[in-house]
Amino acid sequence: MKKIALPIIVIVAILAIVFSLKKLMSTSSDNIFYEPFKGTVHGTAPFSQISDSMWLPAIDRGIKLANDEIEAITSQFEEPDFENTIVALDEVGADLDRVLNVFYPLLSANSNDAMMDIAVEASQKLSDYTTAITLNEDLWHRVRSVYNDRESLDLNPEEQMLLQTTYDSFALSGANLEGEDREKYRKLSSELSALTTAFGQNVLKEMNTYEIYLTADDLAGLPESSVTAAAEAAEAKGRKGEYLFTLDQPVYSAFIKYSSRPDLREKMYRLYNGRNTSGEYSNIDNIKRISELRLEIAKLLGSDNYATHSLKRTMAQNPEAVYDLLGRLRDAYRPALNAELAELTEFATKLEGKPVTIKPWDYSYYSNKLKAEKYAFDEEALRPYFPLDKVVDGVFGLATRLYGLTFTPNDSIEVYHPDVKAYDVNDADGRFIGVLYTDFFPRSSKRPGAWMTNFKEQYITEDGVNSRPHVTIVMNFTKPTAEKPSLLTPYEVETFLHEFGHSLHGLLADTKYASLSGTNVYRDFVELPSQFNENYLTEREFLDSFARHYQTGEAIPEELVERLVRSQQYGAAYSCMRQLNFGYLDMAWHTITEPVSDPVDFESKAIETVRIFDDVDGTMISPQFSHIFSGGYAAGYYSYKWAEVLDADAFAFFKEKGIFNREAAYSFRNNILSRGGTENPAELYRRFRGQDPTVDALLKRDGITPTATVAQLNKD
């Protein structure tokens, strides 16, 4: 054979191509999001292998593959049917979900500047991607065709709900729009996505800018745990001998409740409630534009306002039903609030020996002292009985007694931060239920608050395998110190119970389709499992299972439990009216019919009928109201009170049957926790409870004499 001599330039070109291919292959194989996670326990995320350089390539690739899957659906020759269109569409985007289900939980719990920048870029890409799907005319025609034939398809309830949800997601997202309106919707959605992301990032960034250094003379009234933590925080910053306070929720709450320095309480209050109202991280322009964009989108889709548009897929169904509930609660609780404030003013005046006008930064301080005097109750007296490790045992044990679940630490599962722990969750018969991650302590990379989310949702694979969920609960409890473990207040135990209730909703999911699994339910139903769990806080039988003094091992004394129970109704009217402030403000922003020019004046008028204190210059709710401006609760904050009615009614049923009654527990599990969004929640609730919910149990629990009742909450 004759040898062929290749020109050197060709050889170089070939080598360059080979090198490029190898580099491409290496890059692909090095990005762990390009394939299902392999070689890890239960297929959990290999956090140690993740680098920030992986996020955008994986997101881009996921979007491309998802678009290819959409193309495969729309280009097929077969007539549209449930399997080749609705089910196929539900399965689109597995590769994209794999990266997003890790990215967004970490963005909230363990973020950095690079991830925040990536989130901004990704939000635009994802907004464009989702909008392109809902405005895909060929896809919409197929979905609509199947929906129009729904009566002849012989679908089971879960399949019917998947079809209805799919159809609604298109219809409520502009699929019926034509021509210029479609392009306008696309642009509005893209801008809205960018602004909601920016809003959330501003909240986190501004929170991290505050460092308040105090001296020993400034610490009067503060509990030892707060002082010790502040001293250690200052020392870590190289300022030994001083005391560092931030605006992290547990730090702020303790300061405003216990500091006997009204000037410092006022300073902290103004800082905390003045966040994002001005300066580099101001959200004033963001809230104006976000609300305007939502209004424009609603009008484009045929609704008078955003709330009318958004509430179509809820139990409430319309703004009138929301305002009806909020108004009934306002009228029922207002007389009690007036009485509470009058009593508190009288107490403060007596305590100080001079007339006192209660200011918003005074409420927690005097309220805590009155509570201690009236019920001989102080949350700090209970803190030693709630060391975090024992609370974990108690909360997990609650799920064991009710549902037969067990939680076993698994150190073989990778975690994303040293503070995080991972658990195997198994059923009573040993069957694997899922993975639970717990993340308890504040850090600069974590946003404030408490929440539950999924790294992976439950669903049934094409092969019939029940793919189990990976769930995480995230909180911001005070960290342990060198001398003491993390000791929780009753409120923090309640928060733990709340988020754990959400986690059970995810862990116990048993549905065919991921989009209907776990917490993928109507927004005003999603808080039922979490708020139901809170009821156990004051149950002696539950407390006896774990509450032990961290030093002596002594069980929590009966007298303290009785005080805790008696104190639960204390301040109930204030607590409700505070939530109604948020609910009315949310609805005001989302029932506007014209853009808002002055957010300060708008907010003041929105909460006029539920106002507790006079406005404080320089402070607002809206610029930090992440729930409605970046957290998915737009026109939905009322759902906390809606679900509170449900949870009080549900727990009243357990009180009748026994709080650990297995029959009642399994009915709650099988009809509420495991069913996700597979059926109308009103029907699921009736199946569990045997009747519709009423507001009576909530009013009774709070010690409120009803001025009106809600006969039925479900609006079929």
Segments predicted by a language model, with ranges:
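Short His/Asp/Glu-rich catalytic/ion-coordination signatures at enzyme active sites or charged loops
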Residues: 39-54, 102-122, 145-187, 246-285, ...
